[in-house]
From Swiss-Prot:
It catalyses: RNA(n) + a ribonucleoside 5'-triphosphate = RNA(n+1) + diphosphate. Its EC number is 2.7.7.6. InterPro entries: DNA-dir_RNA_pol_bsu_ext_1_sf, DNA-dir_RNA_pol_bsu_external_1, DNA-dir_RNA_pol_su2, DNA-dir_RNAP_su2_dom, DNA-dir_RNAP_su2_hyb_sf, RNA_pol_bsu_bac, RNA_pol_bsu_CS, RNA_pol_bsu_protrusion. Keywords: DNA-directed RNA polymerase, Nucleotidyltransferase, Transcription, Transferase. It holds the Pfam family RNA_pol_Rpb2_3. It comes from the Bacteria. Belongs to the RNA polymerase beta chain family. DNA-dependent RNA polymerase catalyzes the transcription of DNA into RNA using the four ribonucleoside triphosphates as substrates. The gene is rpoB. This is DNA-directed RNA polymerase subunit beta. The keyword Methyltransferase does not apply. One of its GO terms (cellular component) is DNA-directed RNA polymerase complex. The RNAP catalytic core consists of 2 alpha, 1 beta, 1 beta' and 1 omega subunit. When a sigma factor is associated with the core the holoenzyme is formed, which can initiate transcription.
């Protein structure tokens, strides 16, 4: 196998047994693809597909005026260019967006002509606001902050059948219901009541009998009965009736008389119940008719109107129960045929018929009026209004849309074969739904499971943005309709008709403040990827936390391979927010799909199919770990499979599909936990959640025991620099990498140069530090998509969230009681868990009523010492080390003129003293902060003079840009002359540039000429002359292009910044704060084993082994058994082996052993102990040495989830590393030097420092701000609040009888205003006494009682 640039430098020993059938897909595809589809940027007019923006425009346009004389049509749209790139947008605090220009056509019709002749057409491009662009990493920059739009898992549109689980009625009877959910529009519900009548609700309003809706659709009673029932036909034969016999219908009835066959043999005796056997005999006998007495039809319901044959008079209405009176009329009138409804109590209930009986309406108009009254109570109904309302509800494309998904789900559920159709409902749809509902009530068919992933779909960014955009367009439509009527008379253009504000506002609101638009979690690369792969059931149109029950949150069998069963937050959102599984993707309808290998006749093929939850139900799916032979045939007699959402076993011949990988079940975060299969699910959940909170350490350290997913996460997260094209590294320094692109990847006419600017020490959303470090050296060859620079938390292109620590599991002096962690001082000395945090502090100079605020170094009443870190403009120097209270930006604000005394006036007149007009409002370093200034940005309003600092910052930025462009030109020029040299050497010159005719051109000749002289050469061959001309033109062209680029950047930098109204200048100061690990910080492993650092011990006191190597961390062994996360123990053992092997390699290198010996040892590690074979023979000797040097600190291992290292392999590795196979060692106490009683498990575990740092939580207050009403101190660090002394604490003091302490707590330390001021003054005077007074809360209590109208007073004597 071919190794990439970074892979060959450090190969991971992989323990997986199963072959890689399919690579893990690009992890951010769900975001990028969705938004690309929405924008369809770069598509021409004919290429536009009916999705995204295009679909939104087409659904709202054309807009036709009320009179119908003018129309506005949509032609197409185009997106402009963004004003600033992503980095500039973040700095300036603006949105990264492009202008949207829409081409519309205004058509004015001729009023006079009868056939609507066109009078005038105007076409114009209209600006429709800005559309935010997605960055290449799937985020949006909104007002300068990176945000992510989380995908939503919502109920798919379509029709759903359900029952109330017996909860509505006291009898526990199941009440069935059906609900038609459109993509937009009114919901339609059908439901049974306890008396078995069917009702309908529109938009969850008051219920009406379902027959009202059918009547409103234009069905008569007879048509309704015809649709839902079959009929029994009776012929009247004098006193008796003859029934047209369908034997099946008699089943379960009691025979009213003997039933005889043709020969007179009795088949069923009178009074006997008719069974299936009897029915078989009847069918055999071929009896077509059955004589029954007249009263047999008593109580049955008529299916058709019964009419007097002679007079035409109606004897019985349709759907009437037959009684003796009607039967007498029938006999008298000599009616020959009666049709009754066939119903029974088992599988054909009289529900629709009963519903018709309770329905008060009798024709279509009455039904429409009834619906109008329900929808608009209190309004007088008219025929037109009722008809319009009803048509608009379900039959108008403007108001109702099922969407393609909805129509597909609808048709599938009611058993139609076609999956396409109209977006609105039709009569047949509604009848079909009712029929299905009645069938389910009759016991045919089953209800739906709403938590099945075939009934829930994912709405991604693009779709949600499109919906918001449509909302904005609909608002515009109303305004345009009104203006269209004026368009003709006033000769308006399309631009005058359309106001883009509502559209822009709708889009801005969605990206800025929607519940699903979340502030990007930038703790580390994993947290970014996880947020982008989230699916949330919350949000607009979704569930709410309070209403979501247990079922919705639970793991469902269809989650397999689509949604991770492990990763979900703890707390109120559990199960509502999920993560996509590693291989999952969405299909065209938005349902989640998972990949499977096709299996035919027990043979596993290479073909891979993606199936949604609905499609996979009928398949028999084997697990990825099913045993196969070399011919890829399943060899077990019975294979463990999933079928119909159940786990079972089947023969290999029955298997139709097979999983592609064992990790397709879990999400990215869970697949980073080694030995996940040995951890309890609850702890694995904590483990995957805590990896997201790991803070990037100063020096990233790859995990010794990983899972092989680390590289994918680092590559796809976008924090690393990945080569866009292959080539050779031309130059590299800390801030940029320049690649000369390989010739075969250069497109014609463009410079073969890629310049990658690295991000240096910038602030992330979580105030952690983002910094990239190059991995390549000058002259290295890189291929496309090789990793060239590491980002935060990545080490040689692998995710590295924490540090490998030598740990021992032992209880030690109570320092690790209750999950506490005992650390060695060495960890602090080596800066293993030191992190850098970057804080942004902002100073804003505004225009006030009394005059402008000024940023200056001239601050009143501030000593010289406080100003020594500021430059002449009053802004702190970069590189200054500052502490709490230091001035960062000097700023003075004018204050109102105070009345001056005559003496002051005199001094003013003499000295011109102005200092008292302004007060000092400088930006100071907040309390508890100490750090180094690493960057300063100054933004100045247009028209305000820029200070020296702003100009110097601008100059340095321009120098950087110029340097970049010069570099690009240098390489282009060099490459061009190289090509010319290879073309010219050995050819003959005609003259020019001081050469003689016929002189041969050699390298020496060319070296003797300046580059400019080359173009003066005249060659014998015309083709060469042409090449020279082209080269000259190309170089001149490039130079001009780069100069234009420079001017453009310069113009951008020099134009004023767009600041908020009233703001003159903004100065942003960035502080880098270095935080070492200290007691109180939270740490964790990857298995949910979290704890707080309790004590940092000197190295010499820590337990050490026989060689004197001390451990770094001592963990409590009691944290393992009850939590059942044994994965951490296995990780520790394998970590020990990895480290031991690294030490062996290190010794070999130090002894300068031959490369062949190294190769042999590496081969033993990689290829002789289980797992995947590595092709070390492909590496050159130098590469092997390089590899060995990188393995000195330990051989990294990969143990993929559910396919990891076995116990035997771990032992073999320990043996190879010359370590005890038990993984346990004899330790000695560093304090006493005594042996511990028994051997202790020692090894290497990957530990993370989580973003819950004691520095951010610790805080102290003596005095500060107080609450307005109660006058008690505020709470919380943000408000600089106090410690709460609550009700129970008061009880404790009462119980101890500590009266004075209690009095102090309730008065001077809390809300006795006079007492506390007095006490403060006393302390200042050195007089330590207090006089408690009346607490303010008492006054509040009195006021509250008075507000109830009770007069209450405090009697003082």
């Amino acid at each position: 196998m071919a190794y990439s640039y970074t892979e060959k430098k450090r190969i991971r020993k992989d323990f997986s047994k199963l072959p890689d059938v399919m690579d893990v897909p690009y992890l951010l595809a769900i975001q990028l693809d969705s938004y690309r589809e929405f924008l369809q940027a770069g598509a021409t007019k004919d290429q536009f597909r009916d999705v995204g923006l295009h679909a939104a425009f087409k659904s709202v346009f054309p807009i036709i005026s009320y009179s119908g004389n003018a129309a506005l049509e949509y032609v197409g749209y185009r997106l402009g260019e963004p004003a600033f790139d992503v980095k500039e947008c973040v700095l300036r605090g603006v949105t990264y967006a492009v202008p949207l220009r829409v081409k519309v056509r205004l058509i004015i019709f001729d009023k006079e002509s009868s056939n609507k002749a066109i009078k005038d057409i105007k076409e114009q491009e209209v600006y429709m606001g800005e559309i935010p662009l997605m960055t290449e990493n799937g985020t949006f920059v909104i007002n300068g902050t990176e945000r992510v739009i989380v995908s939503q898992l919502h109920r798919s549109p379509g029709v759903f059948f359900d029952h109330d689980r017996g909860k509505t009625h006291s009898s526990g009877k199941l009440l069935y219901s059906a609900r038609i959910i459109p993509y937009r529009g009114s919901w339609l519900d059908f439901e049974f009541d306890p008396k078995d009548c069917v009702f309908v609700r529109i938009d969850r309003r008051r219920k009406l009998p379902a027959s009202v809706l059918l009547r409103a659709l234009g069905y008569t009673t007879e048509q309704v009965l015809d649709a839902f029932y079959t009929t029994n036909v009776f012929h009247v034969r004098g006193e008796n009736l003859s029934l047209e016999l369908v034997p099946q219908r008699l089943r379960g009835e009691i025979a009213v008389l003997d039933i005889l066959d043709d020969k007179g043999k009795v088949i069923v005796e009178q009074g006997r119940r008719i069974t299936a056997r009897h029915i078989n005999q009847l069918e055999k006998a071929g009896i077509k008719e059955l004589e029954v007495p007249l009263d047999y039809v008593l109580g049955r319901t008529t299916a058709k109107v019964i009419v007097h044959p002679a007079t035409g008079e109606i004897i019985a209405e349709c759907n009437t129960e037959l009684n003796t009176e009607i039967l007498a009329k029938i006999a008298k009138a000599q009616v020959v045929r009666i049709e009754t409804l066939y119903t029974n109590d088992i599988d054909c209930g009289p529900f629709v018929s009963d519903t018709l009986k309770i329905d008060s309406t009798s024709n279509q108009l009455e039904a429409l009026v009834e619906i109008y009254r329900m929808m608009r109570p209190g309004e007088p109904p008219t025929k037109d209004a009722a008809e319009t309302l009803f048509n608009n509800l379900f039959f108008s494309p403007e108001r109702y849309d099922l969407s393609a998904v909805g129509r597909m789900k609808f048709n599938r559920r009611i058993g139609r074969t076609e999956i396409e159709g109209s977006g609105v409902l039709c009569k047949e749809d509604i009848v079909a739904v009712l029929k299905t509902l009645v069938d389910i009530r009759n016991g045919k068919g089953i209800v739906d499971d709403i938590d099945h992933l075939g009934n829930r779909r994912v709405r991604c960014v693009g779709e949600m943005a499109e919906n918001q955009f449509r909302v904005g367009l609909v608002r515009v439509e109303r305004a345009v309709k009104e203006r269209l009527s004026m368009a003709e008379s006033e000769g308006l253009m399309p631009q005058d008709l359309i106001n883009a504000k509502p559209v822009a506002a709708a889009v801005k609101e969605f990206f800025g403040s929607s519940q699903l638009s979340q502030f990007m979690d930038q703790n580390n690369p994993l947290s970014e990827i996880t947020l982008k792969r989230r699916v949330s059931a919350l949000g607009p149109g979704g569930l709410t936390r309070e209403r979501a029950g247990f079922e919705v949150r639970d793991v469902h069998p269809t989650h397999y391979g689509r949604v991770c069963p492990i990763e979900t937050p703890e707390g109120p959102n559990i199960g509502l927010i999920n993560s996509l599984a590693a291989y999952a993707r969405t299909n065209q309808y938005g349902f989640l799909e998972s990949p499977y290998r096709v299996v035919k006749e027990g043979l596993v093929t290479e073909e891979i199919v993606f199936l949604s939850a609905i499609e996979e139900a009928d398949h028999v799916i084997a697990q990825a770990s099913a045993a196969m032979n070399d011919k890829q045939e399943l060899i077990d007699e019975l294979v463990a499979v999933r079928h119909l959402n159940e786990f079972t076993v089947k023969a290999p011949a029955d298997v139709t599909l097979m999983d592609v990988s064992p990790k397709q079940v879990v999400s990215v975060a869970a697949s980073l936990i080694p030995f996940l299969e040995h951890d309890d699910a609850n702890r694995a959940l904590m483990g995957s959640n805590m990896q997201r909170q790991a803070v990037p350490t100063l020096r990233a350290d790859k995990p010794l025991v990983g899972t092989g997913m680390e590289r994918n996460v680092a590559r796809d997260s976008g924090v690393c620099v990945v080569a866009r094209r292959g080539g050779v590294i031309d130059s590299v320094d800390a801030s940029r990498i320049v690649v000369r692109v390989a010739d075969d990847e250069v497109e014609t006419g463009e410079a073969g140069v890629d310049i990658y600017n690295l991000t240096k020490y910038t602030r992330s959303n979580q105030n952690t530090c983002i910094n990239q470090r190059p991995l390549v050296s000058k002259g290295d060859r890189v291929q496309r998509s090789d990793i060239m620079a590491d980002g935060p938390s990545t080490d040689m292109g692998e995710l590295a969230l924490g540090q490998n620590m030598r740990i021992a599991f032992m209880a030690w002096n109570g320092f690790n009681f209750e999950d506490s962690i005992c650390l060695s001082e060495r960890v602090v000395q080596e800066d293993r868990f030191t992190t850098i945090h970057i804080q942004e502090l902002t100073c804003v100079a505004r225009d006030t009523k009394l005059g402008p605020e000024e940023i200056t170094a001239d601050i009143p009443n501030v000593g010289e010492a406080a100003l020594n870190k500021l430059d002449e403009a009053g802004i702190v120097y970069v590189g200054a080390e500052v502490g709490a209270g230091d001035i960062l930006v000097g700023k003075v604000t004018p204050k109102g003129e105070t009345q001056l005394t005559p003496e002051e006036k005199l001094l003013r007149a003499i000295f011109g003293e102005k200092a008292s007009d302004v007060k000092d409002t400088s930006l100071r370093v907040p309390t508890g902060t100490k750090g180094t200034v690493i960057d300063v940005q100054v933004f100045t309003r247009d028209g305000v003079e820029r200070d020296a600092r702003a100009l110097s910052i601008e100059k340095s930025q321009l120098d950087e840009i110029r340097k970049d462009l010069n570099e690009e030109f240098r390489i282009v020029e060099g490459a061009t002359f190289e090509r010319l040299r290879s073309a010219l050497v050995g050819r003959v010159a005609e003259g020019g540039a001081g050469l003689k005719k016929g002189q041969e051109i050699t390298n020496e000749v060319l070296d003797g000429l300046e580059h400019g002289q080359w173009f003066k050469l005249r060659m014998a061959e015309d083709a060469l002359n042409e090449q020279l001309e082209k080269a000259q033109a190309y170089i001149v062209d490039r130079r001009r292009l780069l100069d234009d680029k420079f001017e453009d950047k310069k113009r951008k930098l020099q134009q004023g910044d767009d600041l908020a109204p009233g703001v003159l200048k903004i100065v942003k100061v960035y502080l880098a704060i270095r935080r070492r690990i200290q007691p109180g910080d939270k740490m964790a492993g990857r298995h949910g084993n979290k704890g707080v650092v309790s004590v940092i011990m000197p190295v010499e006191d820590m337990p050490h082994d026989a060689n004197g190597t001390p451990v770094d961390i001592v963990l409590n062994p009691l944290g393992v058994p009850s939590r059942m996360n044994v994965g951490q123990i296995l990780e520790t053992h394998l970590g020990l082996a990895a480290k031991g092997l690294g030490e062996k390699i290190n010794r070999m290198l130090e002894e300068q052993r031959k490369v062949a010996e190294l190769r042999k040892f590496l081969n033993e590690i990689y290829n002789e102990i289980g797992g995947r074979q590595e092709s070390l023979e492909d590496l050159t000797d130098n590469e092997i040495l390089d590899l060995a040097k990188n393995l000195r600190n330990g051989v990294p291992m990969a143990t993929p989830v559910f396919d990891g290292a076995k116990e035997s392999e771990i032992k073999a590795m320990l043996k190879l590393a010359d370590m005890p196979e038990s993984g346990q060692m004899q330790l000695f106490d560093g304090r006493t030097g005594n042996k511990f009683e028994r051997a202790v498990t020692v090894g290497y575990m990957y530990m993370l420092k989580l973003n819950h740092l004691v520095d951010d939580k610790m805080h102290a207050r003596s005095t500060g701000s107080y609450s307005l009403v109660t006058q008690q101190p505020l709470g919380g660090k943000a408000q600089f609040g106090g410690q709460r002394f609550g009700e129970m604490e008061v009880w404790a003091l009462e119980a101890y009888g500590a009266a004075y302490t209690l009095q102090e707590m309730l008065t001077v330390k809390s809300d006795d205003v006079n007492g506390r001021t007095k006490m403060y003054k006393n302390i200042v005077d050195g007089d330590h006494r207090m006089e408690p007074g009346m607490p303010e809360s008492f006054n509040v209590l009195i006021k509250e009682i008075r507000s109830l109208g009770i007069d209450i007073d405090l009697e003082t004597e």
